[in-house]
Amino acid sequence: MAVNMKNIEEVLESELRISEHEAKLFVLIVYKGKVNTEMISKMLHWSIDEADRVAKSLVNRGMVIDITKSEYESLHPRFAVINRYRRRCEENNIIFKKNTKVDNIGMLLEGPYNNARIK
């Protein structure tokens, strides 16, 4: 499957072994920039507890940083997805090597990431 903006969440889930909610939130943070749990809750129609739980999960996976107790920001997408892919390889005792789909995810999200931060 080729990676494009229509299937990016699905590819994030399959290649990085993250949940559907984690993929949705990661893409949201890349597109919006710094967000807090209240904003996440409103934009994704989740409870604040769910928003906080999923954001903390992305922090633990090395894709997002917590700026404050309730504010989150994505790492640069190329770094974030490679970082997660490397961790996934370690978790599954797989040799870390180039993965074109993972590289393409980072490249596709780089434009929206930059646009959200140049406001």
For every predicted segment, state its role.
Residues 32, 61-62:
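Alpha-helix C-caps/helix-loop-beta hinges
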